[in-house]
Amino acid sequence: MARTKATARKTVPAQQEAHGYEFGGPIGASLISFGLPIACYAFGFLCNDVSGCPPPSLLSPSKLFTPPTLSNKVPWQHALDTLAAEVGWPGWSGLINTEAVLGVFFWYGLSLLLWVLLPAHEVEGTELRTGGRLKYRFNACLSAVTIFVACAAGTIVRGPDFQVWTFINRNYIQLLTVNIIIAYALAIYVYLKSFEVKAGNTEQRELAAGGHSGHILYDWYMGRELNPRITIPFIGEVDIKSFMELRPGMIGWVLLDLAFAAKQYKSYGYITDSMRKWTPLLLGIHVLTIHPVIVIISQSVYVFDALYMEPAILTTMDLTTDGFGFMLSFGDLVWVPFIYSIQAKYLSVHPVALGPLYVALILTIQATGYYIFRATNNDKNIFRTNPNDPKVAHLKYIETGTGSRLLTTGWWGTARHINYLGDWLMSWSYCLPTLAAGYKLTPTILFENSRLVSTDGMKGAGIPITYFYMLYFAILLIHRERRDEAKCRRKYGAHWEKYCQIVRWRILPGVY
């Protein structure tokens, strides 16, 4: 996607904002950079279809470290061997295979082809510090619809044995590994390319304010270049950040959910109400045990809202402030699809029937969260693009020295980041369907390679896994709010202080 010239002013060096370390500085960035893959593998293995979620031996540490009487193993070796067996450890060489590599590269290639071939909206981004605006091509929603229509057709023909679903379930850990490698490689690539950015360049390339501290690992994590782009033969110029923000990972998140739903159906012959995330569309052709509640609107609503509102990312912190480094690369390609789908993975092995009352409660939470999330963001987007629109013309605001307007009434008069409240409430509906999570699997002779699922002694043991998203997301949103507050305080100065006196609450009115 070419950079616009019509709106570009003469590119001049921009004055850099004072910017301190974030995320714990170089030490924090280092720990996060090498700790995140470990966390992803931990979630992938600890909630499994071999022994349980979590592995039962973890609930009895004394037994775990006590070898049998005739064993010549030391305690730690016995513990490692036991855990390896219980989590289905494939060995180091088994963490990756050719099938997964080819599948992932096909997925990224398909995403690029749909981006360039399907009709798209071409819009300009916000004005850069150095002047001018970049052009963006948006068709993520149409791309997703194309993909899911194809998957629906395949599922109608093949049912839960549709090749996409079986491929994902057969290679889950290997797919995780390949995406981790791509995330690291991409972060290294954009870091090295960022040193080509020169002050006063005519290509509208600029460094992120917080991404060139001089500390290699910290800058690699935060991202040195604000909007790195790459020219691919037969594809053209691709904005790496905006492309990775929604396509491979967000659409992949829903694909993982659907694959896990297919796995549950193949294993049990039905899909419980707790798993109703698009599954009626794709698997409804088969005979199902349908519960009173038809659909729990959850993760797919969030994803398709983001895809439909794709141009709105142009004014987010990710696009306007953060560089593209390991933080966004790993988050977009690995963390979002593989961690956010953990509840569906859990339910694929341990079906949970919620019942009408619990379904109604979760639907209410989801609907409330979505209403707050969408209403607040709509007000903000409309006000930014057309402040005279009748929907927002009555709202009061403070005008800053930079020309920006800060809303002080309506939704945005209740809290400075009220949209985060809706975002967090929606996260509840992803986790609550797992109830008091925890199960174990016991081999049975009824069928070959079959296991019985039970919750005996396991109820609640899986909560740290299936409810992790709620806690993590709360921390993420509070941390993001603090970062945004610091940025706005630097940018708006006294006007921001005045704004905070009028709009006192940060996220939750009356509480925080």
Curated annotation (Swiss-Prot):
GO BP terms in the entry: ergosterol biosynthetic process
GO cellular component terms given for this protein: endoplasmic reticulum membrane
Name of the gene encoding the protein in the UniProt record: ERG3
Lineage: Eukaryota, Fungi, Dikarya, Ascomycota, Pezizomycotina
Source organism (scientific name): Septoria lycopersici (Tomato leaf spot fungus)
The protein's name: Delta(14)-sterol reductase
GO molecular function, one term: NADP binding
InterPro entries attached to this UniProt entry: ERG24_DHCR-like, Sterol_reductase_CS
Residues that coordinate or bind NADP(+): 380, 384, 407, 412, 419-420, 484, 488-492, 499
Disulfide linkage: none
Location (main, coarse): membrane
Keyword Transferase: no
